[in-house]
């Protein structure tokens, strides 16, 4: 009888080639799989991990979620401590729990929350270059805040998905889309909570919103972009370094509570 574990993971994506395992590349999936199998004494049948979503190279996470099965039961705190003793310093397990054997980290999600940090300055800040997306020209937060609400709701986001997406259905629902400025840090920050997000969707939305803030697009352009269903209309993609997978939701009551809170 196997025991299924749910793990909440945080990582600095700077030195990872993304989440998904790739040949001859350092990925989150690769280092976590190695640690899990080492903790389990390298079983004959290797343990496989399943993540809630794939992050690209350079993208960070506070709350990536994954699951795996062990052939026996260990106290969740023992699993957390054991994995953290084996994982590299840019990765940490924040929480571990035992879940039903039919739980799936990817398919049981009811929502995800992403955070983006856009740094505005003529030159790159060496201390922010791995943790913010750099934008050379300043954006007007008032224009962005006027426009961002048009992304909320259920839409076909074909304009906001990068080529290479494996999703056949581009309809997603954004429950909440917010932006605010931190003038002392020269940052504009964004937070998006939705049913799920397409490949590079958040980064493309941020790129469009920053162009609106810079006056390169009209404040009311988003409905027309959505209607166009044409990736070429959105043009750019914000840098990966500014994006953080903040939280994955599996319970509607927790999702609704956070929507009220934030």
From Swiss-Prot:
Coiled coil: none annotated. Keywords: Isomerase, tRNA processing. CDD domains: PseudoU_synth_EcTruA. GO terms for biological process: tRNA pseudouridine synthesis. The keyword tRNA processing applies. It catalyses: uridine(38/39/40) in tRNA = pseudouridine(38/39/40) in tRNA. SUPFAM superfamilies: Pseudouridine synthase. GO terms for molecular function: RNA binding; tRNA pseudouridine(38-40) synthase activity. Its EC number is 5.4.99.12. Disulfide bonds: none annotated. Homodimer. NCBIfam families: hisT_truA. Formation of pseudouridine at positions 38, 39 and 40 in the anticodon stem and loop of transfer RNAs. Belongs to the tRNA pseudouridine synthase TruA family. This is tRNA pseudouridine synthase A. It comes from Lactiplantibacillus plantarum (strain ATCC BAA-793 / NCIMB 8826 / WCFS1) (Lactobacillus plantarum). The lineage of its organism: Bacteria, Bacillati, Bacillota, Bacilli, Lactobacillales.
């Amino acid at each position: 009888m196997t025991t299924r574990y749910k793990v909440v993971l945080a990582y600095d994506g700077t030195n990872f080639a993304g989440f998904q395992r790739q040949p001859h590349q350092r990925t989150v999936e690769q280092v976590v799989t190695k640690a899990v199998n080492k903790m389990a004494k390298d079983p004959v049948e290797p343990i496989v991990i399943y993540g809630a979503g794939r992050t690209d190279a350079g993208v960070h996470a506070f709350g990536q979620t994954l699951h795996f099965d062990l052939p026996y039961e260990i106290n969740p705190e023992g699993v957390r401590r054991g994995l953290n003793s084996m994982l590299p310093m840019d990765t940490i397990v924040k929480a571990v729990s035992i879940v039903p054997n039919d739980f799936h980290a990817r398919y049981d999600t009811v929502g995800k929350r992403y955070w983006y940090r856009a740094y505005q300055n003529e030159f790159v800040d060496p201390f922010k270059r791995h943790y913010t997306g750099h934008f050379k020209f300043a954006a007007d937060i008032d224009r962005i805040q006027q426009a961002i609400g048009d992304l909320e709701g259920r839409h076909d986001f074909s304009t906001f998905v990068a080529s290479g997406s494996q999703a056949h259905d581009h309809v997603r629902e954004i429950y909440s889309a917010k932006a605010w400025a931190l003038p002392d840090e020269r940052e504009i920050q964004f937070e998006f909570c939705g049913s799920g997000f397409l490949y590079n969707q958040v980064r493309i939305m941020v790129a469009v919103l920053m162009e609106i803030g810079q006056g390169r697009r009209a404040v009311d352009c988003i409905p027309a972009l959505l209607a166009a269903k044409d990736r070429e209309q959105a043009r750019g993609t914000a840098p990966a370094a500014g994006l953080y997978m903040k939280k994955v939701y599996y319970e509607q009551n927790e999702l609704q509570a956070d929507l009220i809170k934030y």
